C-alpha cells in the first residue's frame, strides 16, 4: 500500500534490472532514481555523463516498458520527482527518474513549496468487491488500462501476483501465446496512454513549425 523508492547509479542500476522487470509484470508503483555518471562499468564514478537513457528505456529483458522522466536543474528535481510519483501511483507502474552528477553537485536558490500549493496526487485504493464480483480480479482494468490497487491484507481482497505471465483479468498463471501477446500489448498501451494526461510541451524558441526540431533533456537542456 505504499510507494517503493530506490536510488543508485552506474552498475547499480543494471543490478536492479531484474526487480524493475518484476515491477512491470506486477504493475505496481515504484520509483527508480538513477544519478548518471561516466561508464561503462565503474567508469568515472565522480564525473557526470548522460549515457543511461537507452538503459532506462530498454535495459530489461523482454517487452518491459516504463515511463522515464529527467530533471533539468537541482530545483527541477523536486517537480520532476513529484510528477514521477504521481504517474507511478495513478498509473500503477514503475517510473525511472534520471538525474546526473552535474545536477547532483549543483546548487541554486529555491523556495520550498507549501503542501497546499502542490497539485493533488489522488490514490484510489480498492476497498471492496464490485457488484457481481465474487473475488478480486487483479488485472481487471479501468479506462486508463490501470489495474486495481488493493492494500495487502484487506479482508475479501486476497489475491496472488508474481513474475510469471498472468491471464488477463483473473491474474492466473498463463502460458497461452495469444494471452501473452495480449498482455505485452496491454502493458505497452498503458504506458503509452500516460501521455494523454500530460500537457503538451512548449517550444522555448523558434517557429512553431519547421524541418528541424532540437530537443534537449536533463542537465544539457
Q: Where is each model-derived feature located?
A:
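Thiamine diphosphate
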Residues: 1-58, 67-88
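Short, surface-exposed connector motifs at secondary-structure boundaries
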Residues: 2-5, 64-65, 207-212
Amino acid at each position: 500500500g505504499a510507494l517503493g523508492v530506490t536510488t543508485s547509479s552506474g552498475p547499480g542500476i543494471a543490478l536492479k534490472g531484474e526487480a524493475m522487470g518484476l515491477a512491470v509484470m506486477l504493475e505496481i508503483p515504484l520509483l527508480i532514481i538513477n544519478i548518471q555518471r561516466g561508464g561503462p562499468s565503474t567508469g568515472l564514478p565522480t564525473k557526470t555523463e548522460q549515457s543511461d537513457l537507452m538503459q532506462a528505456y530498454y535495459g530489461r529483458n523482454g517487452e518491459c516498458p516504463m515511463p522515464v522522466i529527467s530533471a533539468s536543474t537541482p530545483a527541477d528535481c523536486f517537480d520532476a520527482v513529484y510528477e514521477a510519483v504521481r504517474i507511478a501511483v495513478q498509473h500503477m507502474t514503475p517510473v525511472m527518474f534520471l538525474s546526473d552528477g552535474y545536477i547532483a553537485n549543483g546548487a541554486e536558490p529555491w523556495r520550498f513549496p507549501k503542501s497546499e500549493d502542490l497539485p493533488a496526487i489522488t490514490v484510489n485504493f480498492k476497498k471492496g468487491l464490485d457488484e457481481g464480483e465474487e473475488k478480486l480480479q487483479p488485472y481487471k482494468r479501468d479506462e486508463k488500462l490501470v489495474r486495481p490497487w488493493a492494500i495487502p491484507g484487506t479482508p475479501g481482497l486476497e489475491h496472488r501476483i508474481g513474475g510469471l505471465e498472468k491471464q488477463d483479468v483473473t491474474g492466473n498463471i498463463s502460458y497461452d501465446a495469444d494471452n501473452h501477446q495480449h498482455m505485452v500489448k496491454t502493458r505497452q498501451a498503458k504506458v503509452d496512454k500516460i501521455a494523454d494526461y500530460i500537457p503538451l510541451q512548449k517550444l522555448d524558441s523558434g517557429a512553431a513549425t519547421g524541418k528541424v526540431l532540437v530537443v534537449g533533456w536533463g542537465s544539457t537542456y
